[in-house]
Design a protein with these regions (language model features):
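Structured C-terminal helix/loop/strand segments within mature extracytoplasmic catalytic/sensor domains
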Residues: 2-7, 11, 27-69, 180, ...
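Bacterial N-terminal signal peptides
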Residues: 14-22
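Hydrophobic membrane-targeting alpha-helices
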Residues: 21-28, 115
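Active-site-adjacent loops and short helices of periplasmic peptidoglycan-processing enzymes
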Residues: 31-212
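Short, motif-level signal for alpha-helix interfacial/capping segments enriched in acidic residues
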Residues: 82-84, 229, 284
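A short small-residue
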Residues: 88, 146, 237-239, 335-337
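Active-site-proximal helix/loop microenvironment
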Residues: 194-271
Length: 373
């Protein structure tokens, strides 16, 4: 795999007339005794100034495809695709913060696994869910409470949050790792860019609706009933404010870069990296989104997110993930539909088309990769 990645870089350097210089600069790093004999006396490995990193341009056909898909969709949409191996990125509106909704569960789990790597918490830490922990909307764990209590673990909460998008599981995990402050600190420490973590599920959803949160809203459909009683202008003002400046906003390019760092092992230990990607590959949500265009032999580790609806508009319809080809090459993909009135099938089709274009590009490059190898 290292050889194939080098071949891509070598071709790019050759086109720029830099291949000989790059090869000379790389030679002292080899462990070949013949090269060592040619080094000057007193040479210290790594003493030379660092070479400037060569940026491989994004493939023009894929740039054209992504621009066309997003430009023809309408609404507020950001898409980013990054080659985890070559490093290039294709993005359209990639720097515009979009409502994350449940995509933000990824940052909570990353924070938890980071603390596990530090020895501060464990996957097997016992935790208790009570009625005071319940949130709203999708929370299947609520049905497991017996006499108002359910005993669980960090491991189960991660699984439920990441594969079922269980809001209560995520919020309980969030509290265990130190709340939004801890998550935002993780994002900042790892320089993940334009990614904000909001106040948690209850405050996020109540503010988007124009309500002040009450724990009674966690029971049954109490939240929906209270929301329906609000004057239309109150709901619309809150909805528009959230879409314009989402408190959980994240840019598609920043998410793609973060997923790239995850896949490269730059965020977590090898064990935690493998564990999280495995959990994300077993996700049960969004079968008609990115996953619908994943061919046999390919793998997708992903997280979806979906916001509230108001008068035919949706604030956040997202899917982000790591798409891995049979040959091991991988791409970080983020499709963030911040606001749209397009039908659900159209939104899903946009996501499917993005994956289809990435796969088509990858397959079109296969003959060149084989020749280079």
């Amino acid at each position: 795999m290292v050889l194939s990645r080098f071949s891509v870089l070598e071709r790019a350097l050759t086109l720029g007339g830099l291949a000989p210089l790059a090869l000379i600069g790389a030679a002292p790093q080899q462990q070949d005794g013949r090269i060592t004999e040619l080094l000057p006396p007193g040479y210290v490995h790594g003493s030379a100034p660092p070479q400037s990193q060569v940026v491989i341009p994004a493939p023009t056909p894929l740039v054209t495809d992504i621009n066309s898909l997003v430009g023809g969709f309408g609404g507020k949409v950001g898409v980013a695709v990054k080659s985890i191996d070559a490093g290039w990125m294709v993005a359209k509106n990639g720097d515009v913060p979009m409502p994350q909704q449940s995509v933000s569960k990824l940052w909570v789990t990353l924070t938890a696994l980071d603390q596990i790597d530090q020895g501060r918490i464990s996957l097997d830490d016992p935790l208790t869910i009570t009625q005071s922990d319940l949130t709203l909307f999708h929370q299947p764990i609520a049905s497991l409470l017996k006499n108002g209590v359910y005993q669980t673990t960090v491991r189960e909460l991660i699984r439920r949050a990441m594969t079922m998008s269980d809001n209560t599981a995520n919020d309980r995990l969030l509290r265990h790792v130190g709340g939004p402050t801890a998550v935002n600190a993780f994002i900042t420490r790892h320089s993940l860019g334009a990614i904000k973590f909001g106040p948690g599920e209850r405050l996020l959803q109540s503010r988007t609706a124009g309500l002040a949160w009450k724990q009674d809203y966690a029971m049954g459909r109490a939240f929906q009933a209270a929301r329906a009683k609000l004057p239309p202008n109150v709901r619309q003002a809150a909805f528009n404010s959230y879409v314009a400046n989402p408190i959980d906003g994240a840019a598609a390019a920043s998410i793609a870069n973060a997923l790239t760092k995850l896949r490269r092992g730059e965020l977590l230990s090898p064990a935690s990296t493998s564990y999280l990607i495995g959990v994300m590959e077993s996700s049960r949500t969004g079968h008609a989104r990115l996953r619908a265009s994943v061919p046999p032999g390919w793998r997708l580790a992903h997280k979806t997110g979906t916001g509230q609806d108001l008068m035919g508009r949706t604030a956040g319809f997202n899917d982000v993930g790591i798409l891995t080809a049979p040959d091991g090459r991988a791409y970080a993909v983020a499709v963030m539909i911040g606001e749209t009135s397009r039908p659900t099938q159209d939104r899903q089709k946009l996501m499917q088309n993005v994956v289809a274009r990435v796969v088509a590009y990858h397959d079109s490059e296969a003959p060149q990769r084989l020749m280079a190898e």
